[in-house]
Amino acid sequence: MIRAAVMADAPQLAALMTQLGYPTQAKEMRARLRSIFSDNSFRTFVATDDEQIVGMAGTSEHASYEHDDRTGRIVAMVVSDNAQRKGAGRQLMRAVEKSFRRRGVRRIVLNARLERVEAHQFYEALGYRKTGWRFAKLLE
């Protein structure tokens, strides 16, 4: 089942973010969710199985310099290791796309770390195409 995330999900979402490669404590996730939930451009979806969260997708939307359409961004997408290849990822992506369509978003972009080759294949199977590289720099 797919539903909107709530604050009580913070511990399970922290575990998923840690699995994704971003070590996160429940306290940190609660602070992040407070900020995210207060911003109407963000949506957070969770996939559940027997009341347990097995996946999450976090999205945002924004205007664009390069075209007139609003752009939807999948900011975070993860399915727990033991729930992969069981449909939760596809259900999350369908929910994300449906939510964007309802709000008039026509373009969706996402980033996937280079080492996540299986994720790249998953997105390509859903019709997403590689279009460039992402660069990052931590400002001190």
Question: Where does each model-flagged region fall?
Answer:
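Conserved G/P- and acidic residue-centered "switch" motifs that form tight phosphate/ATP-binding loops
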Residues: 9, 51, 87-89, 104
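Acetyl-CoA-dependent GNAT
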Residues: 7-11, 15-69, 75, 138-139
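Conserved GNAT acetyl-CoA-binding A-motif
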Residues: 93, 100-112
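Residue-level recognition of the GNAT/N-acetyltransferase active site
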Residues: 62, 80, 84, 113
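Conserved acetyl-CoA binding element of GNAT-fold acetyltransferases
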Residues: 69-81, 133
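Hydrophobic adenine-recognition pocket in adenosine-nucleotide-binding enzymes
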Residues: 5, 77-79, 112
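Conserved active-site alpha-helix within GNAT-family acetyltransferase domains
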Residues: 90, 106, 114-132, 137
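Conserved acetyl-CoA pyrophosphate-binding loop and the N-cap/start of the following alpha-helix
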Residues: 83, 87-95
